[in-house]
Amino acid sequence: MKNFETLFAELSEKAATRPAGSRTVAELESGVHGIGKKVVEEAAEVWMAAEYESDEAAAEEISQLLYHLQVLMLAKGLTLEDVYKHL
């Protein structure tokens, strides 16, 4: 099972190596604006799932939001430590 740190490490590797066909690479290439739009979309899906769907559906949507937030972090050159210091 992945956790926040292992996901970030995996995404960082993909950002560095740019494997062909990678969803992460495609999203990074869409830039901060494109990634930001995806974050907003996923946040709305989290809300709707939490409000109207099962806990399992909400957890899945939250995991997708976390993925897109981490891609945004990579696009901005932010590390986990950059974020953790604000928690």
From Swiss-Prot:
GO cellular component terms attached to this protein's record: cytoplasm
Keyword Nucleotide-binding in annotation: yes
Gene Ontology terms, MF aspect: ATP binding; phosphoribosyl-ATP diphosphatase activity
Pathway: Amino-acid biosynthesis; L-histidine biosynthesis; L-histidine from 5-phospho-alpha-D-ribose 1-diphosphate: step 2/9
Catalysed reaction equations from the record: 1-(5-phospho-beta-D-ribosyl)-ATP + H2O = 1-(5-phospho-beta-D-ribosyl)-5'-AMP + diphosphate + H(+)
Listed EC numbers: 3.6.1.31
Domain of life where this protein originates: Bacteria
SUPFAM superfamilies referenced in this protein's UniProt entry, alphabetically: all-alpha NTP pyrophosphatases
Enzyme class, first EC level, given as a word: hydrolase
Main location: cytoplasm
Keywords: Amino-acid biosynthesis, ATP-binding, Cytoplasm, Histidine biosynthesis, Hydrolase, Nucleotide-binding
Nucleotide-binding as UniProt keyword: yes
Subcellular localization(s) per the UniProt record: Cytoplasm
GO biological process: L-histidine biosynthetic process
InterPro entries for this protein: HisE, PRib-ATP_PPHydrolase-like
HAMAP family: HisE
Family to which this protein belongs: Belongs to the PRA-PH family.
Entry protein name: Phosphoribosyl-ATP pyrophosphatase
Phylogenetic placement of the source organism: Bacteria, Bacillati, Actinomycetota, Actinomycetes, Micrococcales
This protein's encoding gene: hisE
